[in-house]
């Protein structure tokens, strides 16, 4: 008698942007066509929300703010999210993993993201926050608001990944425009979410699944996440070095107790190259760390390798400070810093093409005069 084996249902993943910065990040992901994720935009500013490209859009605190935003006040942002708590819970329902992004220091994002995170965690989802810290030139008050917001947020989710905007300066040259610099931050978020979701939704040469992700990120606190890219003869090792030394990220990998990394390359990628990359990463972390990795083929990456590293389990709240030059001497080659991928070091950075998808079946939770409209 034959038996029918039913494959397990794929993990349900949702990505939520809260406030202006968070919604911008979601727009980028929608344009890039990341598959296997439900995208949701949340904002108090009704006009800004009309520009959101996520299929599901939620206006927060319609009665409280009248669609005019939170005025930079996190308390107002929190109250707005609380007013819309029922709708937030509705759009999160059924998710196995939820990414929540925002730019800390403002009103809606800073105040609203803890409410959204708490709702996701209470729903049983693995909840991952990805946030940016403001530039120093934005002023001390905004930085203080951001720090207080992160303290409040950290206890509401499983993992908190922080991208400090000031570290963007390490990826820029004198000709880099402000717009290009912010797109670099979007790149870090985009590739990180893509790599994590790909591990869950795409079978690989060495496969990881949702259980693997959960083992590293469940209740793990602050996390270190980076993407490195390499090309040529030493592409895998170069990608690993670039990921380990990224100036964008706020912590060093050395104190991590859990590490997940994903190697993506073309069909010419060899086992020896994967081993080289794995060794470089393993040597940089605690010998007792729980290390898991996957390998995924992407035909378009013929002569390139991309490595995404996610490190968790740091002892301090936000982890050890980012590595300095002395700590990274072993990552130097011929006097050239490998803290960024080769295409950036050679001045060949270009933002990925803005392939805007036509989003069908949008679902709006933007209150109308007498009802909530869902298209």
Residue ranges and their predicted role:
Residues 1-375:
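Tubulin/FtsZ superfamily GTPase core signature
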């Amino acid at each position: 008698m034959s038996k029918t084996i039913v494959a397990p249902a794929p993990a349900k993943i949702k990505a939520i942007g809260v406030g202006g910065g968070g919604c911008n990040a979601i727009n980028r992901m929608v344009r890039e066509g990341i598959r296997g994720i439900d995208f949701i935009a949340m904002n108090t500013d009704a006009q800004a929300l009309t520009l959101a490209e996520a299929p599901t859009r939620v206006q927060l605190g319609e009665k409280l703010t009248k669609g005019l935003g939170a005025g930079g006040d996190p308390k107002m942002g929190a109250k707005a999210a609380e007013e819309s708590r029922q709708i937030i819970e509705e759009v999160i329902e059924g998710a196995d993993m939820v990414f929540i992004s925002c730019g800390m220091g403002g009103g809606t994002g800073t105040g609203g993201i803890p409410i959204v995170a708490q709702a996701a965690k209470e729903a049983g989802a693995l909840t991952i926050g990805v946030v940016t810290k403001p530039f120093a030139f934005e002023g001390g008050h905004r930085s203080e608001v951001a720090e207080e917001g992160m303290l409040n947020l950290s206890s509401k989710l499983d993992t908190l990944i922080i991208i400090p905007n000031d570290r963007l300066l390490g990826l820029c040259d004198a000709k880099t425009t402000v717009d290009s610099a912010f797109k670099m931050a979007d790149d870090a978020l985009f590739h990180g979410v893509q790599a994590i979701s790909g591990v869950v939704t795409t079978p690989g040469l060495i496969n990881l699944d949702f259980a693997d992700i959960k083992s590293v990120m469940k209740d793990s606190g602050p996390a270190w996440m980076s993407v490195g890219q390499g090309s040529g003869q030493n592409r895998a090792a170069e990608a690993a070095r670039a990921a380990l030394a990224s100036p964008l990220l706020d912590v060093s990998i050395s104190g991590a107790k859990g590490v997940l990394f994903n190697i993506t390359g073309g069909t010419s990628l060899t086992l020896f190259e994967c081993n080289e990359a794995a060794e470089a990463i393993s040597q940089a972390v605690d010998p007792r760390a729980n290390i898991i990795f996957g390998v995924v083929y992407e035909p378009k990456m013929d002569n390139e390798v991309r490595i995404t590293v996610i490190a968790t389990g740091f002892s301090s709240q936000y982890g050890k400070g980012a590595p300095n030059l002395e700590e990274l001497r072993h990552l130097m080659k011929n006097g050239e810093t490998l803290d960024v991928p080769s295409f950036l070091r050679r001045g060949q950075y270009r933002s990925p093409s803005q392939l805007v998808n036509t989003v069908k079946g949008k679902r709006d939770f933007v209150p109308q005069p007498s009802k909530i409209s869902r298209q």
